[in-house]
Amino acid sequence: MIMDLQFFSHHKGGGSTANGRNSAGRRLGTKAADGSVVTAGSILYRQRGTHINPGENVGRGNDDTLFALVDGVVKFERLGRDKRKVSVYPVAE
């Protein structure tokens, strides 16, 4: 005699998966291209950590966002062998 017992009181319902979710992108990266003209306070680069360092006339926010301190032209430059910086140079009028 073969008995086929199924105890359904402890089975999980088959409806959703445990890993079926993803977080939205954080919109990080370059916000002002090299050579573009920006005003003071403009966001130049959004980042987590100091992927790019602040150069001349560039400030760094609490979340490591780089922003222009003066009106001028954006310039991305090398800082040594393996680092980069972004600077803003005022335009002579």
From Swiss-Prot:
Residues 8-29 are annotated as: Disordered. GO terms for biological process: translation. The N-terminus is cleaved by ribosomal processing cysteine protease Prp. Residues 1-8 form a propeptide. The keyword Ribonucleoprotein applies. The keyword Mitochondrion does not apply. GO terms for molecular function: structural constituent of ribosome. NCBIfam families: L27 (TIGR00062). This is Large ribosomal subunit protein bL27.
